[in-house]
């Protein structure tokens, strides 16, 4: 008698790997997105050093330094011009440097250089020495800002769903530097000869703290996010010369002239209008906070607009913000101006990186970002001296009017820029 045959239904059935539950997949995606946000925020402390601490803090230091050292507005603007000239040299050198060293290495070198030079400004009173130090600080700032932009673009391409947000988070990090400056500078100024010097030391210490986080984030991005592979149509895009995006470059250059006039002299204008130090510090804090939150505000625009339209919109809004305190001398107008300006000006910078990411292949990003940074630096060189000269002869309000007109002209140029290739 044969033993009863065992059922083989379970064994004969085809076997499949169990699919992960939908909730698990969603949680993994959420964790990946949050990790990308954290990296972008960490990296953004590099932009906090490059612009917020190393450059825009000077607007708060300008009034006490001008009074203590007997400068004219043109002389005071010359220090920002020297800083912008250094920024230009750094931007021009970046494509060559990036072929020899990784972006993370260049960012770290820029952080060290900038922190040391910020401290050096605290022991210097001679105009010539300060000019040299501010020029060298600009070189360090460019290394930080451009290499950080390359890494942010790489992170954005690895997370296309949040690409605009990630770029905005990186550039919006400048707001952290503005907020830190607006708190540190008034707290460390002392009422004596050269009483502005301790503020430079405080800013240098803030640079060191921010650098530790930014360099760590840069290393993780380089380790986890390699440059994406080139696409089929990348060969044609790689051959595109800067002449093909000349309108965007021109609009961005005029942005550099117009925005730096505002950021250099707005604090002096408010103080000349009789506003207290507390009001001015609160204004600068609000400007910085608006810069930080701007990442979310404009992320959709940066994702949708592949040509120069985003830069055009932002330049026009910046022109309006710049006109407000020149035409209406009231704290309320100043605060509205600061919030609008803060919410838009670093997104204008982010829009150029978004343009490069949309229109050039990954191996062309360093060259593209460097081209925008270079024209931006030319604008920043001209801006402080030109607006300072106008302000010396016709008043600070007239200088801001000229800044606004420059921004409107930049909006018109950027609006003429078309995308270099169609969306994939």
Give the label of every model feature segment.
Residues 58-59, 244-285, 289-292:
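Extracytoplasmic gate region of multi-pass secondary transporters
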Residues 70, 102, 123-129, 306, ...:
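Helix-breaking motifs and short loop linkers at transmembrane-helix boundaries and internal kinks
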Residues 90-102, 294-306, 391-392:
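Helix-to-loop junctions at the C-terminal end of transmembrane segments
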Residues 105-119, 309-323, 404:
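Structural signature of the two symmetry-related core transmembrane helices
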Residues 117, 128-136, 332-340:
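Paired small-residue
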Residues 133-172:
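Cytoplasmic helix-loop-helix junction between adjacent transmembrane helices
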Residues 162, 166-219:
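Helix-loop-helix hairpin linking two adjacent transmembrane segments in secondary transporters
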Residues 359-396:
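A late C-terminal transmembrane helix in Major Facilitator Superfamily
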């Amino acid at each position: 008698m044969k033993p009863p045959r065992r059922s083989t239904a379970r064994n004969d059935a085809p076997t499949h790997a169990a699919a992960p539950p939908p909730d698990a997949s969603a949680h993994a995606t959420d964790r990946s997105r949050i990790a990308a946000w954290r990296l972008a925020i960490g990296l953004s402390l590099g932009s906090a050093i490059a612009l917020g601490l190393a450059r825009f803090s000077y607007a708060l230091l300008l009034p006490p330094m001008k009074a203590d050292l007997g400068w004219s507005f043109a002389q005071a603007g010359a220090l920002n011009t020297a800083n912008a000239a250094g920024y230009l040299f750094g931007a021009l050198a970046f494509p060559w440097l990036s072929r020899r060293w990784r972006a993370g290495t260049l960012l770290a070198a820029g952080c060290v250089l900038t922190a040391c030079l910020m401290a050096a400004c605290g022991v210097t009173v001679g105009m010539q020495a300060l000019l040299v130090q501010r020029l060298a600080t600009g070189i360090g700032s460019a290394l930080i800002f451009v290499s950080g932009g390359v890494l942010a673009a790489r992170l954005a391409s690895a997370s296309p769903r949040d690409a605009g947000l990630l770029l905005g988070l990186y550039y919006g990090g400048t707001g952290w530097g503005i907020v830190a400056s607006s708190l540190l500078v008034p707290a460390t100024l002392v009422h004596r000869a050269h009483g502005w010097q301790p503020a430079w030391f405080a800013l240098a210490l803030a640079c060191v703290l921010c650098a530790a986080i930014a360099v760590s984030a840069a290393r993780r991005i380089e380790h986890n996010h390699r440059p994406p592979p080139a696409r089929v149509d990348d060969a044609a895009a790689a051959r595109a010369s800067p002449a093909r995006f000349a309108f965007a470059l021109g609009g961005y250059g005029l942005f550099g002239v117009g925005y730096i006039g505002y950021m250099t002299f707005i604090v002096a204008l408010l103080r000349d209008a009789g506003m207290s130090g507390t009001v001015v510090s609160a204004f600068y804090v609000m400007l910085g906070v608006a810069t930080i939150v701007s990442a979310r505000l404009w992320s959709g625009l940066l994702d949708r607009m592949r040509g120069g339209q985003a830069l055009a919109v932002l330049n026009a809004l910046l022109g309006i913000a710049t006109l407000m305190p020149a035409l209406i001398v009231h704290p309320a107008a100043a605060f509205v101006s600061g919030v609008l300006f803060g919410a838009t000006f670093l997104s204008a910078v982010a829009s150029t990186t978004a343009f490069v990411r949309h229109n050039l292949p990954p191996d062309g990003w360093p060259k593209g970002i460097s081209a925008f940074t270079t024209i931006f630096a030319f604008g920043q060189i001209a801006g402080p001296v030109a607006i300072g000269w106008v302000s010396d002869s016709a008043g600070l309000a007239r200088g801001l009017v000229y800044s606004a007109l420059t921004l409107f002209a930049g909006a018109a140029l950027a609006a003429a820029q078309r995308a270099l290739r169609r969306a994939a």
